[in-house]
Amino acid sequence: MTIVEELLFTERFLWEGKSYVVHIYRHAAKKERCLHMAETVLGPGDTIISDGHSAEEALHKQQTILPLAILSRALL
């Protein structure tokens, strides 16, 4: 099975004065449906990933979960 990954676009997510980069990818596997993925690297070995049926859905999920992810790291 061949998996193809394509960067569609990059967005900035602003939270409490900081900017976080969100990359939106499309993954397509032969003979399977397409999946979209949003990825944000918060630090070394710390990556947040959300998926969706569309790029917009993946981005919306990522924007919803990022504040919680960022705040949870501040507690550590």
Q: Residue locations for each model-derived region?
A:
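Generic cytosolic/nucleocytoplasmic N-terminal low-complexity/intrinsically disordered segments
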Residues: G17, A29-K30, E56, H60
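Short linear proline/tyrosine/threonine-rich motifs used for host-factor recruitment
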Residues: V21-H23
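Compositionally biased, intrinsically disordered low-complexity segments
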Residues: E6-L7, Y25-H27, P44, R73
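Negatively charged, low-complexity tracts enriched in Asp/Glu with abundant Ser/Thr
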Residues: M1-S19
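Mixed-charge, Lys/Arg-enriched low-complexity segments
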Residues: G43-L76
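Short aromatic-glycine-(Arg/Gly/Cys) micro-motifs in beta-strand/loop hairpins
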Residues: R26-T47
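Compositionally biased, intrinsically disordered low-complexity segments enriched
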Residues: F13, Y25, A38, A55, ...
